[in-house]
Amino acid sequence: MTKSLLSLAVTAFILGGCSLIPDYQTPEAPVAAQWPQGPAYSPTQSADVAAAEQGWRQFFHDPALQQLIQTSLVNNRDLRVAALNLDAYRAQYRIQRADLFPAVSATGSGSRQRVPANMSQTGESGITSQYSATLGVSAYELDLFGRVRSLTEQALETYLSSEQARRSTQIALVASVANAYYTWQADQALFKLTEETLKTYEESYNLTRRSNEVGVASALDVSQARTAVEGARVKYSQYQRLVAQDVNSLTVLLGTGIPADLAKPLELDADQLAEVPAGLPSDILQRRPDIQEAEHLLKAANANIGAARAAFFPSISLTANAGSLSPDMGHLFAGGQGTWLFQPQINLPIFNAGSLKASLDYSKIQKDINVAKYEKTIQTAFQEVSDGLAARKTFEEQLQAQRDLVQANQDYYRLAERRYRIGIDSNLTFLDAQRNLFSAQQALIGDRLSQLTSEVNLYKALGGGWYEQTGQANQQASVETPKG
């Protein structure tokens, strides 16, 4: 019996090397080898530190924003859910991995039964006792064709994908907090600008109204001045509402209220961000967690094909135990009371109405779907980086042009005001200068906000936002396979 068990174990070990998982090959990236070139793009420059390895504390210069990001990483609910999902998939992997090994259990039992006389072979009533103690394996599947190992591989890749999903969630959170913060700052600047402009309009309106009372200004001039005041009041209410809504958005992202001891923010036009290098398109394949997540899911689908293939072959399960059996507890472990059970079972699929073939087809289709998703993720990443690179140069030029436009409108406003005060030009010219200056100043703040959010999105598109400090990438080890 011992030789038979040994032979079976050796055979299972030899066949255990059999795997029906298809050889995995990473699909070709469906994007160009270089970033787009043209007048809208600046020449790409190399750097010692890739964007994905640049710490967010080095990228964001505003101490208030750094404080908000740190708060969000502690309290944000989406990030908490992503971390819990990671723990859940790790547990699922450990559960599946445990099927590779036999589950050994020890059992002990005892029973006493009274047998009536008419049921006894001796014709007399009596009491029978039975006690047992066994150690054994129950329904352990010998993984001859790799079905269990395929499922374990699938669970591992799913777990690894959840780790990358958590990284993606954090990177997206850092960018979202930054964009929400800059929007809040911009709306505050617009609100302050509108408040100052409204005061100017009201002063002009009161002056025009007094001029009308003495016959210098016409009723039309008064009406035009009032129109400017009411228009500014509309903007005042609008920006007041937006500032309040910006605070609400930030509160959700932070997972708590804005800290009362928030550091003093930088001015919106200050040096807010460090420049990030674009690198090569091939770099994002290794640095974007969403791409790595998609590839892990593709590998998981590939492993499922191995499990579907293995279902066509016989499966062998083994139940075995050894122990002792005695009618007397005191002699349970005495010599001669030994007992054993060896119960192999083989299951050979013969007819299943095509379900196994359909299951294999389904697993192959799922792999093709994941290939398409993987390629789409790469294409989306390429587009996001390309858009960010195009925005970088054009926003610099646009902002400079807008600053020049504001300066020109300030000159126009000063001249128009002077000419209106001394009676050379009408009130219409002066009001037009006021409106043009107000519009140009609003546009400058809006363009600056668009530039900042574009740079933040480029940092995110390049995989930045995972590390707090530059240099941590070399200190942190890659994700380890969890131990069972």
From Swiss-Prot:
Q: Name one GO cellular component term.
A: cell outer membrane
Induction description: The ttgABC operon is repressed by toluene; this is mediated by TtgR. The ttgABC operon is induced in response to chloramphenicol and tetracycline.
Which InterPro entries does this UniProt record tie to the protein?
Answer: OMF, OMP_efflux, RND_efflux_OM_lipoprot_NodT
Gene Ontology BP term (one) = response to antibiotic
Its keywords, alphabetically, are:
Antibiotic resistance, Cell outer membrane, Lipoprotein, Membrane, Palmitate, Signal, Transmembrane, Transmembrane beta strand, Transport
Location in the cell reads:
Cell outer membrane
Positions where lipid (S-diacylglycerol cysteine) attaches: 18
Q: Where is the signal peptide?
A: 1-17
Give the residues carrying a lipid (N-palmitoyl cysteine): 18
What is the protein's major site of localization? membrane
State a single Pfam family of this protein: OEP
Q: Does the keyword Cell cycle apply?
A: no
Stated membrane topology is: Lipid-anchor
GO MF term list = efflux transmembrane transporter activity
**Assigned protein family:** Belongs to the outer membrane factor (OMF) (TC 1.B.17) family.
NCBIfam families, A to Z: outer_NodT
Protein task: The outer membrane component of a constitutive organic solvent efflux system. Is involved in export of toluene, styrene, m-xylene, propylbenzene and ethylbenzene. Also exports AMP and the antibiotics carbenicillin, nalidixic acid, chloramphenicol and tetracycline.
Q: What is this protein called?
A: Toluene efflux pump outer membrane protein TtgC
Q: What is the lineage of its organism?
A: Bacteria, Pseudomonadati, Pseudomonadota, Gammaproteobacteria, Pseudomonadales
